[in-house]
Amino acid sequence: MLVLLHAVFITVLTLLLLGRLQLLERLLLNHSFNLKTVADFNILYRSLAETRLLKVVLRLIFLVLLGFCCYRLLVILM
């Protein structure tokens, strides 16, 4: 039971992190209008690429934990 609660807790934290990353991505895109040099554009491009990669990894972790939670719940109910 403790493992299930731990997985649910981490799943919720992962969802919160995804929301924060989406907000960060929007803020970075809003600052794209203030770019003056190519170096600024390169920094923004790298930052956006890193946030997108992190979002993909967090979504994968979320799906794995969600599957684990569902599996544990089915085992407990049977």
Swiss-Prot record:
It is found in: Host membrane. It comes from the Viruses. The chain crosses the membrane at residues 58-78. GO terms for cellular component: host cell membrane; membrane. The keyword Transmembrane applies. The keyword Transmembrane helix applies. Interacts with serine/threonine-protein phosphatase PPP1CC/PP1-gamma; this interaction; this interaction probably promotes EIF2S1/eIF-2alpha dephosphorylation. This is Non-structural protein 7. It comes from Porcine transmissible gastroenteritis coronavirus (strain FS772/70).
